[in-house]
Amino acid sequence: MAECCVPVCQRPICIPPPYADLGKAARDIFNKGFGFGLVKLDVKTKSCSGVEFSTSGSSNTDTGKVSGTLETKYKWCEYGLTFTEKWNTDNTLGTEIAIEDQICQGLKLTFDTTFSPNTGKKSGKIKSAYKRECINLGCDVDFDFAGPAIHGSAVFGYEGWLAGYQMTFDSAKSKLTRSNFAVGYRTGDFQLHTNVNNGTEFGGSIYQKVCEDFDTSVNLAWTSGTNCTRFGIAAKYQLDPTASISAKVNNSSLIGVGYTQTLRPGVKLTLSALVDGKSFNAGGHKLGLALELEA
């Protein structure tokens, strides 16, 4: 008698995001596609040997200040290693070495150092991250002559529900300098995020994918001891595979609009504008232009 093989339906593995990425879908609708007051150029390319080069330059239209960064990255996939070199126009040099999934599955260790030749200032950081089903942990140590600072975070997820905690312990002061909580819920097209920072700042956001081409987001924040409540609504609509428009408005009557167009594969143009609705005739509005090149 032939054996009957019955396929086993495995439940998909759900790894929660790191604490910094909680509520990211809602924040992206507010932040991406806008660049008020800046003229920006980003260039990304990759050599035949696998070295990735990233260059970014921007000019602030208000102050006229020009800044730029250069980054090179090489991945040694066989050993799970990534080497990154960074430089910026403040003449700060950075080196980062990361190893992932080698010591154990889901563990990533990063060694990050920076050095400023002008001031002689040096800094070092060791980062660790561990992610498995239903859990995402992180612990970073900032080294300082006064004493290291320890940053820790943990996010737990179960059937769409997320709960996280983030802290910073300053060994020089021997006390917690940051203590944040977050609770959220997410599905394929809906995300809810709430957070409390240091017991004084309260925030929440909602992300909703209304349809395939239309995304919306709502953001609310309040600080205890003040009457200041911040509220905003944002939306993004994909006109076609190469173009999208974004818009947002907050309770301060600041209205932002953005238009992104892929001119050709690897070339993307973004135009944006910020209008102050309270003083429309007084000026002070901002424009932005960004060009991204990738090859």
UniProtKB/Swiss-Prot annotation:
GO cellular component terms, alphabetically, are: acrosomal vesicle; membrane; mitochondrial membrane; mitochondrial nucleoid; mitochondrial outer membrane; mitochondrion; pore complex; sperm midpiece
Tell me if Cytoplasm is a UniProt keyword of this record: no
Reactions accelerated catalytically = chloride(in) = chloride(out); K(+)(in) = K(+)(out); a 1,2-diacyl-sn-glycero-3-phospho-L-serine(in) = a 1,2-diacyl-sn-glycero-3-phospho-L-serine(out); a 1,2-diacyl-sn-glycero-3-phosphocholine(in) = a 1,2-diacyl-sn-glycero-3-phosphocholine(out)
Could you say which protein family the record assigns here? Belongs to the eukaryotic mitochondrial porin family.
Q: What about PTM?
A: Ubiquitinated by PRKN during mitophagy, leading to its degradation and enhancement of mitophagy. Deubiquitinated by USP30.
Q: What does this protein do?
A: Non-selective voltage-gated ion channel that mediates the transport of anions and cations through the mitochondrion outer membrane and plasma membrane. The channel adopts an open conformation at zero mV and a closed conformation at both positive and negative potentials. There are two populations of channels; the main that functions in a lower open-state conductance with lower ion selectivity, that switch, in a voltage-dependent manner, from the open to a low-conducting 'closed' state and the other that has a normal ion selectivity in the typical high conductance, 'open' state. Catalyzes the scrambling of phospholipids across the outer mitochondrial membrane; the mechanism is unrelated to channel activity and is capable of translocating both anionic and zwitterionic phospholipids.
Q: Where in the cell is it found?
A: Mitochondrion outer membrane; Membrane
GO BP field: binding of sperm to zona pellucida; mitochondrial outer membrane permeabilization; mitochondrial transmembrane transport; monoatomic anion transport; negative regulation of intrinsic apoptotic signaling pathway; negative regulation of protein polymerization; phospholipid translocation
N6-acetyllysine modification, residue list: K32, K121, K278
Site Involved in ceramide and phosphatidylcholine binding: which residues? E85
Glycyl lysine isopeptide (Lys-Gly) (interchain with G-Cter in ubiquitin) crosslink: positions? Answer: K32, K65, K121, K122, K173, K278
Residue numbers binding ATP: K24, K32
Q: Which residues carry this modification: Phosphoserine?
A: S252
As stated in the Swiss-Prot or TrEMBL entry, residues carrying the post-translational modification Phosphotyrosine are: Y79, Y237
What InterPro entries does the database record attribute to this sequence? Porin_dom_sf, Porin_Euk, Porin_Euk/Tom40
Tissue localization of expression: Highly expressed in heart, kidney, brain and ascitic tumor with very low levels in liver. Expressed in the head region of epididymal sperm.
Q: Which UniProt keywords apply?
A: Acetylation, ATP-binding, Ion transport, Isopeptide bond, Lipid transport, Lipid-binding, Membrane, Mitochondrion, Mitochondrion outer membrane, NAD, Nucleotide-binding, Phosphoprotein, Porin, Transmembrane, Transmembrane beta strand, Transport, Ubl conjugation
**Free-text note regarding domains:** Consists mainly of a membrane-spanning beta-barrel formed by 19 beta-strands.
- What organism does the record attribute this protein to? Rattus norvegicus
Protein residues bound to NAD(+)? L254, I255, G256, S272, A273, L274, V275, D276
Protein's name in the database: Non-selective voltage-gated ion channel VDAC2
- Quick check: keyword Acetylation in the entry? yes
For this UniProt entry, which segments traverse the membrane? 38-47, 51-59, 66-76, 81-88, 92-101, 107-116, 123-132, 135-142, 149-157, 162-170, 175-187, 190-197, 201-210, 214-223, 230-239, 243-250, 254-263, 266-275, 285-294
Q: Name one GO molecular function term.
A: oxysterol binding
Q: Which domain of life is it from?
A: Eukaryota
* CDD domains in alphabetical order: Porin3_VDAC
